[in-house]
């Protein structure tokens, strides 16, 4: 089952609530683009094997987050610079002469 960015952000909110409940409040207010957010990421990675997201509807089911660690890492390493994002996108097509000719 596909893991959406909304699923990950919902899990982050639950992680923050869990850390508050456990009185682990160090950098609990850090935003995803701040360096201190790394504490949330470390907590999530340490507990990823136990992480589930319940998806509702008439036939509720659970998504295991451990299967989606690559996607989660990608979301937590979002590119915040337009220039860096452009370079990353272009680098996907290095060696693709046809794509290069179309973009110039």
Swiss-Prot record:
Highest taxon listed in the record's lineage: Viruses
Keywords from the named record = Transcription, Transcription regulation
- Transcription keyword on record: yes
Name its GO BP terms in alphabetical order: regulation of DNA-templated transcription; viral life cycle
Q: Which residues cross the membrane?
A: none
Q: Pfam families, alphabetically?
A: Baculo_LEF-11
What InterPro entries does the record tag this protein with? Baculo_LEF-11
Q: Which family does it belong to?
A: Belongs to the baculoviridae LEF-11 family.
* Role: Involved in late/very late gene activation.
What name does the UniProt record give this protein?
A: Late expression factor 11
Species of the source:
Spodoptera exigua nuclear polyhedrosis virus (strain US)
What are the top taxonomic ranks of the organism?
A: Viruses, Viruses incertae sedis, Naldaviricetes, Lefavirales, Baculoviridae
What gene does the UniProt entry assign to this protein? LEF-11
């Amino acid at each position: 089952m596909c893991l959406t960015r909304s699923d990950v952000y919902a899990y982050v909110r639950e992680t923050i609530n869990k850390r508050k409940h456990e009185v682990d409040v160090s950098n609990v207010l850090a935003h995803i683009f701040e360096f201190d957010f790394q504490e949330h990421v470390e907590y999530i990675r340490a507990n990823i094997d136990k992480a589930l997201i319940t998806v509702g509807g008439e036939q509720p089911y659970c998504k295991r987050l451990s299967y989606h660690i690559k996607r989660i890492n990608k979301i937590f390493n979002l590119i915040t610079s337009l220039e860096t994002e452009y370079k990353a996108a272009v680098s996907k097509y290095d060696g693709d002469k046809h794509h290069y000719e179309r973009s110039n």
